[in-house]
Structures are given as C-alpha cells and as structure tokens.
Amino acid sequence: MASFRRRTCTTGTRFAEVGRRLAIAADHAGAALKAAIVARVAEVAPDWSVADLGGDGSDPTDDYPDSARAVAERMIAGQADRGLVICGSGIGVTIAANKFHGIRASIAHDPASARQGVVHDDMNVLAFGANLITLETALETLAAFLQSEPSSEERYLRRTAKVADIEEEQS
C-alpha cells in the first residue's frame, strides 16, 4: 500500500485542460494492463485526457481498495468524468468503487456490455479483470465506454433514479 498511497496522495498527476477526463488506477495484479492501456488510450479515445493514479506493480500491497478509492475520490471531487479500475478479476475493484456515493461501477469485458452499461445504467466507472481480458479487447471495450452517453429515455432515467434513491436511503 505504501507505493500506491505515495503516488495517489500527491498532486503531481494533472489532467490536460482540454477534452474529457479519465482517471485510471490498478492494483498490483492490474498494473501491467493499466500501463499498456495508458500508453495507447489516445488511439481509441483522442478527446480524453488520462490521469494515471497509480499501481505500478512493484508493490504487492498496492491493493484493489486503494485503486478504487483513488479513482472514486477524483470523480467525486469533479476532477474526472469517468473512471477505469483494474485488478486481477475486476470484481474487487468493482465492489470497492461502488461503496462511494455516486459511483456506478461495473465489470465489462466486451464493448456491447460497456456501451449498455453507460446507455442504460449510467455507468461511470469501468472495471477490468487483468487476468480475463486481452489488451486489444480492453481497448475496444474502453472505447465503447468512453464514446457512450447515458440515455435520456424516460424508462432509463426512471431506473437510474430508483438506484439513486436506494443509495440515498442507505447513506
């Protein structure tokens, strides 16, 4: 946890002033995939700037709750429009990210699921399992996630409002 906290508690990572902002972090198991995505994200999402919030794989105590927290806190602070969290399975980071008010995280390992997660469910954080997805599929899925927008259809708005009501009731 020490190396992750050092990286995420500093103010050194800055977003570009143009376009939309993606915050990305990984635990030790997701670090290699995260680094590969960061290196190529401009290919699939040129209008998005990226803040790499840590998890470089050098410290086995870079745990999934820390990476989920880093992304969620950036989003809650209004410093990111969407988030990407990565661990070995994608499950741990999803559970941890969803503990934060206003975060709607889900695993998606294919473009159709990522697109539907945003359009139907207003998903704002995408999770990958590094042990379960290839880099090329991850990039295609990330592109679908970032290119999609929540639907303004009444049925989807009604459903996401119900989810928000549950979140408020449980706060």
Predicted regions and their residues:
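Short, solvent-exposed amphipathic alpha-helices that sit
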Residues: A32-E43
